[in-house]
Regions:
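Short hydrophobic alpha-helices and adjacent helix-cap/hinge residues
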Residues: 2-198
């Protein structure tokens, strides 16, 4: 009978897994991560709208938006939160210790306070790191310019991921007789000026 259809539809909707995807900003590499995640879910039989409901939210670079998005995912009892980039992951971790959180595009998950270790993340959080190996980059740079003596490092000092890479670079430089000249920025409008000063 038609009177039961709404209940059946409601039961079907509530049986779907709810996946919240939070992304700090639109960016080609971050968008690729999101799209790849959704494609892989689909390949594994979890097509959006069938067995799973995917709710993608973009914070547009705003920390307050990040917090609000993650609070919504928690209050609506999502089954898993996918957090793309460190700020998204930190916001999600700050809102729940129960809902599983999977992060991507986080350079230093331990230093960012997301997990206790890479080998055994612990708690409700796991994911992948996109750590850049400063020593490997320097080895390549030295292949191109063998007599390099000074390296410029332009980074955002308030971002733990950036600081981690620069610390690795400084350690490599100290061991290999190189000098690191640092230039820090707080926003993208400062990049050109600080880069010129290096």
């Amino acid at each position: 009978s038609t009177s039961k259809q709404p209940e059946t539809q409601k039961a079907s909707e509530s049986a779907k897994l709810k996946v919240g995807i939070v992304q700090i900003v639109e960016h080609p590499s971050l968008n690729t991560i999101r799209e790849s995640f959704i494609q892989e879910l689909d390949k594994q039989g979890f097509k959006d709208g069938d067995k799973v409901t995917i709710d993608y939210q973009n914070a547009q670079g705003d920390q307050t938006n990040l917090k609000t998005i993650c609070q919504k995912f928690v209050s609506n009892k999502y089954d898993v939160i996918i957090a793309i980039a460190t700020p998204s992951a930190q916001a999600a971790v700050g809102e729940t210790k129960e809902i599983p959180i999977v992060f991507a595009a986080c350079t230093d998950p331990v230093g960012s306070g997301l997990v206790s270790s890479l080998e055994k993340p612990g708690g409700n959080v796991t994911g992948t790191s996109d750590a850049v190996s400063a020593p490997k980059i320097m080895e390549l740079a030295r292949l191109i310019t063998p007599d390099i003596k000074t390296v410029g490092a332009l980074y955002t000092s308030s971002e733990t991921n950036s600081v981690s890479v620069v610390n690795d670079l400084k350690a490599y430089a100290a061991q290999n007789g190189l000098t690191v000249v640092e230039g820090t920025v707080t926003n993208s409008s400062e990049v050109q000026q600080v880069a010129s000063s290096l």
